[in-house]
């Protein structure tokens, strides 16, 4: 924990760790020497069985071989898109691109043709690496349709066809010099509020952020981390993959999030750490109650992407007898901004998102004047430091709007900071509810509702109203099979907050529409309501 004495909602970068001037490829080469025979990667296949594995020496060898292949086919700085689930080839391509000076563009394997085409076209990708199908999605057919007329895309490669994946091209096969400030990836924002933008992330941003994360999550060379977060997101290919790399520990890569399979692998492979959004953790607990497993090896569970209910934290700590932390960030910051410490209290874990990461300045600023606000005052969370994206790809206007002239990246998230430097998130600027001229912050209302025993997950949104402009509405996923009681929840809210913040419309849902990173798509809930899909209780 940092023992800080700020005078306002501003924490300057803490120098308890250094920013290393290093590329992803540099790290792989370092660790392959230091931990040559240690297991780096273990595959878990679709059926939940373990498959192929690599030592760090083998991982470097295959990555360098693939890098030479890519260098013979593409020029340094060109962009290639990976459109695949969590398969080992994904990681090989990530490392090979880093070694070859290529920019990796990530795409969600659930995309349909228009979504895929947007990413390919907006990024200017010259190649598409994919699996032919995944979970019923005919990806090869979709790719053919998506690339019609896209002259920039020179080839479509099936990553399961290693002859095609590793083939040599016509160019000289020489690996170039790559610099820490060079672009490593273009990650498309998950779009909780609209169309995605491509955040260009540098090698030094991704590598240092992942190291800071893994260190605060107590990773060691003896750790074994489960990775069931999507590789197309910075959590999967950044925090976990590059975090494990820098500690030379073992990563178990799950092709599919299957709670029962994950619990079996936790037992058989002695998993010590994992990261999951709250929905995933709930599913693991539900599966564990049906089919018990020995999960005593787990030392750390980390969650992010949404506020965590106190009951969920207690249940995880009881079931796994482990430490629990939450993290907060966004794609544009590579991705982490704050993280808890292992010794933090359950109150801090549930009411805040922790303290800033090392070498990261964080401030809470007024939206109107861009000035730092007093403690415990809602404003926009802003970030300054090594972790900030280079730009939004081919979008100068959005880049200028996101990063001001002083280098502060404006996250679009509303939050507060207390006198210890702990940050709380109260919602998105664009999700703030304005009822009769008064600002309502969804996260504040959600946190109150998460304390109710019948509430498993919740999303509070503003819905249009002729009288008030907007009214507060609440979508609930129940903790039991029983229907929720709106009157009971209304009473709970009135006992814990002002009456105008209490939802006036209640909806029960079986599942929430989620982004690829597990965040609730609140604008979609609003749109579905307006189209008549939801009826209030």
Regions found by a protein language model. Give the residues of each.
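Conserved AMP-binding/adenylation subdomain of ANL enzymes
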Residues: 207-224, 232-273, 283-287
């Amino acid at each position: 924990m940092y023992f800080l004495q700020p005078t306002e909602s501003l924490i300057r970068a803490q120098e308890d760790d250094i920013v290393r001037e290093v590329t992803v490829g540099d790290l792989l080469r370092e660790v392959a020497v230091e931990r040559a025979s240690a297991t780096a990667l273990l595959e878990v296949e679709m059926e939940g069985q373990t498959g192929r594995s690599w030592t760090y020496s083998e991982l470097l060898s295959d990555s360098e071989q693939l890098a030479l292949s890519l260098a013979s086919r593409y020029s340094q700085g060109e962009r290639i898109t990976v459109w695949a689930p969590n398969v080992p080839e994904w990681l090989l391509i990530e490392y090979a691109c880093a070694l070859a000076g290529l920019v990796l563009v990530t795409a969600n394997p659930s995309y349909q043709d228009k979504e895929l085409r947007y990413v390919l076209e907006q990024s200017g990708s010259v190649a598409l690496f994919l699996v032919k199908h995944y979970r019923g999605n005919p990806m090869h057919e979709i790719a053919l349709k998506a690339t019609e007329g896209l002259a920039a895309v020179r080839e479509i490669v099936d990553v399961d066809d290693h002859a095609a994946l590793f083939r040599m091209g016509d160019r000289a096969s020489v690996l170039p010099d790559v610099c820490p400030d060079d672009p490593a990836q273009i990650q498309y924002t998950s779009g909780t509020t609209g169309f995605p933008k491509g955040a260009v992330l540098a090698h030094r941003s991704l590598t240092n952020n992942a190291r800071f994360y893994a260190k605060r999550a107590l990773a060691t060379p003896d750790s074994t981390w489960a990775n069931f977060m999507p590789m197309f997101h910075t959590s999967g290919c950044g925090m976990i993959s590059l975090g494990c790399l820098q500690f030379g520990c073992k990563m178990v890569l799950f092709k599919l999030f299957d709670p029962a399979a994950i619990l079996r692998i936790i037992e058989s492979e002695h998993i010590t750490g994992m990261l999951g959004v709250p929905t995933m953790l709930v599913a693991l607990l539900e599966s564990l109650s049906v089919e018990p497993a020995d999960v005593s090896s787990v030392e750390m569970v980390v969650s992010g992407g949404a506020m965590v209910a106190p009951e969920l934290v207690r249940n995880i700590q009881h079931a796994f007898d482990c430490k629990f932390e939450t993290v907060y960030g966004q794609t544009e910051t590579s991705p982490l901004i704050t993280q808890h410490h292992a010794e933090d209290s359950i109150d801090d874990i549930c009411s805040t998102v922790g303290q800033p990461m090392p070498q990261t300045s964080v401030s809470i600023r007024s939206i109107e004047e861009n000035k730092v606000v007093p403690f415990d005052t809602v404003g926009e969370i802003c970030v300054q430091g090594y972790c900030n994206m280079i730009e939004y790809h081919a979008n100068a206007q959005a880049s200028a709007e996101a990063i001001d002239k002083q280098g502060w990246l404006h996250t679009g998230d509303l939050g507060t900071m207390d006198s210890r430097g702990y940050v709380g998130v109260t919602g998105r600027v664009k999700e703030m509810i304005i009822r009769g001229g008064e600002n309502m912050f969804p996260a504040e209302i959600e946190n109150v509702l998460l304390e109710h025993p019948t509430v498993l997950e919740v999303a509070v949104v503003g819905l249009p109203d002729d009288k008030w402009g907007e009214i507060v509405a609440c979508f609930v996923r129940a903790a039991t099979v029983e229907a929720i009681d709106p009157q009971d929840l209304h009473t709970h809210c009135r006992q814990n907050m002002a009456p105008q913040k209490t939802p006036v419309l209640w909806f029960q849902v079986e599942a929430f529409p989620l982004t690829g990173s597990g965040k609730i798509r609140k604008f979609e809930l609003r749109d579905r309501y307006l189209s008549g899909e939801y009826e209030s209780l």
